[in-house]
A protein has these predicted regions:
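C-terminal outer-membrane beta-barrel translocator/porin domains of Gram-negative envelope proteins
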Residues: 1, 127-201
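Gram-negative/organellar outer-membrane beta-barrel architecture
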Residues: 1-131
Length: 201
């Protein structure tokens, strides 16, 4: 697969303290990421994000493969469109706390297995979610870290859905990354990073 990446960034697009960015990937699998953020410093900041991701892939999708002995793989077509609005506040430029609303559309289909010449649809639903996050970054450098802490904690609650398959149940997911770095004897640096997550339903 091949693609061309195009990026556009602009400060002060609508107001003096905003930042707009758009990443667009043109190719076999079209994708984009759009971000708009109004940074009010220690006051409440706000923004929006929008993304589109589409791809085709050969997959050993067990529910289909197990029911069709003559099929070893299916050609899966997957589309994810996500839109978010959020609010954020910061403390000392190193600690950020935010929350927002999300609308996500997921469509997954295959033409490998058809019924009456109609493609099989695994999902074609809209999901409505709320999310929150906490970020702490006291690392002294971006790449070659010698000291500091990092915490990136995220929580998302899938509240409701248009429920194409009539089997949706509300659930929540939490995940996080925690890191630590320290330097000993001026030249030896120890850095560790841990990730974890779980689902509640």
């Amino acid at each position: 697969k091949s693609g061309i990446l195009a990026n556009y960034s602009k400060k002060n697009l609508l107001v003096n303290n905003d930042l707009f960015s758009l990443d667009l990937i043109l190719g076999d699998n079209l994708r984009y990421n759009l971000n708009y953020f109004v940074d009010n410093g220690f006051y409440i900041s706000y923004g929006l994000r929008s993304s589109y991701n589409h791809f085709r892939a050969n997959s050993k999708f067990k529910p289909i493969v197990s029911q069709n002995p003559n099929v070893s793989k299916i050609n899966l077509q997957y589309t994810d469109i996500t839109n978010q609005i959020f609010f954020q506040t910061t403390f000392s430029r190193k600690f950020a706390l935010g929350a927002g609303l999300e609308q996500k559309h997921i469509e997954a289909t295959t033409e490998t297995v058809q019924i009456n010449n109609v493609e099989t649809v695994f999902d074609n639903s809209n999901y409505y979610n709320v999310f929150g996050y906490l970020k702490l970054d006291t690392y002294d450098q971006k790449y070659f870290v010698t000291k500091g802490f990092l915490a990136d904690l995220n929580f998302k609650w899938y509240v409701s859905s248009s429920d194409y398959n009539n089997n949706f149940k509300s659930f929540a997911q939490a995940k996080g990354t925690i890191g630590f770095a320290a330097t000993f004897w001026d030249k030896l640096t120890f850095q560790t990073t841990h990730e974890a997550g779980f689902t509640l339903n």
